[in-house]
Amino acid sequence: MRATGGTAAGQLAFVRGFTRYQWLVFFVVWAGWSLDATDFGLFSLVLRPALTELLGGQPTIADIGRVGGILSTVGLLGWSLGGFLFGIIADYIGRVRALALSILIYSVFTGLQGLSHSPLELGIYRFFAGVGTGAEIIVGIPLVAEAFAEIHRAKILGVMMTGGAMGSIIGGQVYALIGGYGWRYVFFLGIVPAILLAVIRRRMFEPERFADVQQRRRSS
């Protein structure tokens, strides 16, 4: 039993030397990833009531499933595009600015989904919310990796991935609390991640590596 306790303590000892700034970077990216996962979990829960209203009439389960599948695909296409584009954009405007922009896009378009009047409108908002989600992940992971020493990166990135599971848990609890007020209010909650923007703008700065890349780009 002592050996087991010592091993566990040794595994956790690596976090003791982290600075406040490193924890800040980790928390912001982890929180962003958690809220992204919350959105995807909530979307599956509100899909039926949302499409029942937006399709009009008396849509069948097959109708809802077909349109819901299209909307989910559209969101994932946006996710892919956001990851591709922001992987490039971040090299030019910086990872911190790119992270702030990705969270802004995600928050605005997730909130706008609550104002949808048709499946097409919902799909458009869903696509751009997906762009923000994909961008946040592709920018956030390198930002965390660059904030920590190489010896700790694998561990801290592994811990960061717990945000996905936490987001699913949060999504279920949020729906249990406010789902009864209507599906639109669930989407309005997507504006909450915008709070992180204030933290990013005031507290976070670009890694030294970005400054080096910018300097080499000017010199070339």
Language model features: what each stretch is:
Residues M1-S220:
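Transmembrane-helix signature of 12-pass secondary carriers
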